Design a protein with these regions (language model features):
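Tandem repeat scaffolds
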Residues: 1-67
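Short, helix-capping/interhelical loops that line the mouth of catalytic, cofactor-
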Residues: 63-89, 137-185, 244-251
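Amphipathic, non-membrane alpha-helical segments in soluble helical-bundle scaffolds
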Residues: 83-94, 119-126, 174-181, 220-223
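Alpha-helical packing segments of well-folded alpha/beta enzyme cores
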Residues: 89-96, 100, 132, 173, ...
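Charge-dense, helix-prone N-terminal extensions
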Residues: 95, 105-107
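A preference for well-ordered globular domain cores
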Residues: 101-103, 117
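Short, contiguous alpha-helical
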Residues: 109-163, 186, 203-251
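Proline-centered turn/helix-capping motifs that create local helix->coil transitions or kinks
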Residues: 144-146, 192-201
């Protein structure tokens, strides 16, 4: 088998002509302006952003978007551009997450600390969403330079920053994490409830040490990032809960 070399620092990949790749898990890889000629894909799972991807002359992006929206009608509402749109999207997310949390409670508590296929556990997912809300709403929108809770969890590839918690070894209970989450959800809900059309056209700046450090960043984009994180991570959580439920039944 030909070895595949991935250089994540420059986000490039060197794959020799005629390479044969089997049983390989490729993560966090970006392909831009790439042509695959004579490609054979069999029993392949692709999860990620698909844009301007043509297969055998067909742009598959719109087809995938339409099918995902058909399967999940709420998905089309996760690209808000108006005050009412953000309010609707956040209400949907809180409703959906309530059902996911109820489902998680039916599992043994120790399984909520168990990742599936190297992904975050359910508890870690909630901790990361707490981090995202603190970063983009607490810090960027509300201007609190240090909005963190000790259980907040940045993404795995984050460089790390002084003063920002990053404890991958913590094992808090579901109720403990949800206690933080309720406060963060309320914070976002209150910001969105008070949102005005004028604010959606404004920019925000935070240059104090930490992350994010941005100047004149669109306020609407801060809110959209949180909406996007909440939507996608719930799908991942539901997928992994399915796997954990199956494992529990088999045992």
């Amino acid at each position: 088998m030909t070895r595949v070399v991935v250089m994540t620092a420059s986000i490039t990949a060197s794959i020799p002509r005629g390479a044969h790749v089997e049983h390989t898990d490729l993560r966090a890889i970006s392909f831009h302006h790439v042509r695959f000629l004579g490609l054979e894909l069999v029993d392949v799972e692709i999860t990620g952003a698909i844009e301007d991807v043509t297969i055998n002359g067909v742009d598959i992006g719109p087809l995938i978007e339409a099918e995902l929206n058909r399967r999940m009608p709420d998905r089309a509402r996760m690209h808000p551009t108006t005050v009412e749109g953000f309010q609707e999207a956040w209400a949907i997310l809180e409703r959906l997450w309530a059902g996911t949390e109820d489902r998680a409670r039916t599992l043994p508590p120790e399984l909520l600390h168990e990742g599936v296929r190297g992904e975050w556990s359910f508890i870690e997912t909630l901790r990361h969403l707490d981090f995202a809300s603190a970063a983009w709403v607490g810090r960027m929108v509300l201007g609190d330079p240090v909005p963190w809770h000790p259980l907040d969890l940045p993404w795995d590839e984050a460089p790390g920053w002084e003063g920002i918690p990053w404890d991958r070894e913590a094992r808090p209970s579901l109720d403990e994490v949800l206690g933080v989450r309720r406060k963060r959800q309320a914070m976002v809900r209150e910001v969105i409830a008070a949102l005005t059309p004028e604010q959606l056209d404004e920019t925000v700046t935070c240059t104090e040490p930490g992350w994010p450090q941005l100047e004149d960043f669109p306020l609407a984009q801060c809110l959209f990032i949180v909406v996007n994180e909440e939507w996608h991570h719930r799908l991942y959580a539901e997928r992994d809960l399915d796997a954990l439920v199956t494992t529990t039944k088999e045992n």
